[in-house]
Amino acid sequence: MIYNEYSNNIAKRIGHYTQLPDGWAVAPMQMLCSLIDGEKQNGIERINLDVKYLRGERDAKTLTSGKYVAANSLLILVNGENSGEVFRTPIDGYQGSTFKLLSINYDMNTEYVLQVINLHRTILRENKVGSAIPHLNKKLFKAIEVPIPPYKEQQRIVEAANKVFMSLDVIMGSL
């Protein structure tokens, strides 16, 4: 369960279903994915996949050692104001120091898990830990209770959510 600063069960307060459809389960996020580091490498020149580069705010800088991350990997920001933000790496490179590699279990739809993480971004952002530099509250992240439908239903949910987001983009563009 996820609790807010008043020790109220947030899931209960926002009305999450207590009865799930047949074939569904609930599991904490830590059962669905893990936050790890890339494999350490030395002597190979690669791009530093830091947050400014991944946002397109800075040109690539190269390093000759670091924690290797393959192209199309998922990096989650664990330090700073936007902790919980997830990036997909465009190329092979070295993991930026403010990131962890987000490793999602093979039996979960990656986009479904990313939708769940995105759903909880505000809670994660508002409940950071650390005084000098805010950090992702990993305990809170790992404890997020995730409703898990069968895989095909995960795909259907992602497709439906994407259609809604596309419609919202059209509406926002016309305002």
Show which residues each predicted segment covers.
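Non-catalytic DNA-recognition/assembly elements of restriction-modification systems
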Residues: 4, 8-39, 50-54, 147-175
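Basic, amphipathic alpha-helical recognition segments used for DNA target recognition
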Residues: 28-34, 39, 87-92, 100-148
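Short, solvent-exposed loop/turn positions at domain surfaces
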Residues: 20, 62-63, 130
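ATP/adenylate-binding site constellation spanning eukaryotic-like Ser/Thr protein kinases
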Residues: 80, 138-141, 162
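A short beta-sheet element
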Residues: 52-59, 65-118
